[in-house]
Amino acid sequence: SVKTAWILLILMLFFSLFIVLAIPTESRNLCLLLATLSLPFILLYPSAKRWFKYPQLILSICWGFSVLIPWAASESSLAGGVTLLFCWLATIFWTFGFDTVYAMADEFDDKEIGLNSSAISLGRNSIKAVSICYFVASFLLAIAAFKATLGLIFWPFWLISTLGMQREVFLLSSKSKGIKTSGLHFSNQVRIGSLLLLGMILSKII
């Protein structure tokens, strides 16, 4: 209902304000600038399926700010060199890949009502494109990890995650592009990301 929507909006704004106030003073202006720069992409995305062949790219850019803003909050700058750049690019490729899979579930309905998606635009090459996106994301993360001098313990986690991504692509088929398959694929990407995060944390504390 409208009332529920307003309540949720007020709660989200309250928590957002709390997060902003929790950011170190020296980082706050840069974080707010990045958040402002992300707004055009966030506002464009809901309508992008009507006028852009690859709306998933806009969503990927939105997700990319989830790398830039925490980095800015931690370092008070974007001077992260190759590590930051490649983490950002990896996020964009990874997001484009799994959201393309998610778009496969809506492919028939989107065609019926004249909407666009990367799944429709890529057609038969969509699964191959997802595989390439995952490979590029893994490769970029490997370079970023190397430049960040992560410990040896990270690399088994990276290898398992990389193989896991490609396994998920292998399990996709033209006969199983339904909501359930796409949802499971999306959930497994969360698990793979959590595995990578665990590897990063362990490499810093062991």
Task: List PLM regions with ranges.
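Residue-level recognition of pore/gate-forming positions within transmembrane alpha-helices
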Residues: 13-16, 39-42, 63-64, 91, ...
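Cytosolic, membrane-interface loops and tails of multi-pass inner-membrane proteins
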Residues: 99-124, 170-181
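Alpha-helical transmembrane segments of multi-pass membrane proteins
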Residues: 38, 42-46, 90-95, 102, ...
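Alpha-helical membrane-embedding segments
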Residues: 18-27, 67-74, 90-101, 144-148, ...
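Intramembrane alpha-helical segments
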Residues: 2-82, 86, 167-173, 185
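Extended hydrophobic alpha-helices typical of membrane-associated regions
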Residues: 139, 143-206
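Alpha-helical transmembrane segments
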Residues: 82-94, 150-158
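Multi-pass membrane catalytic core of lipid/isoprenoid biosynthesis enzymes
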Residues: 1-35, 112-152, 158
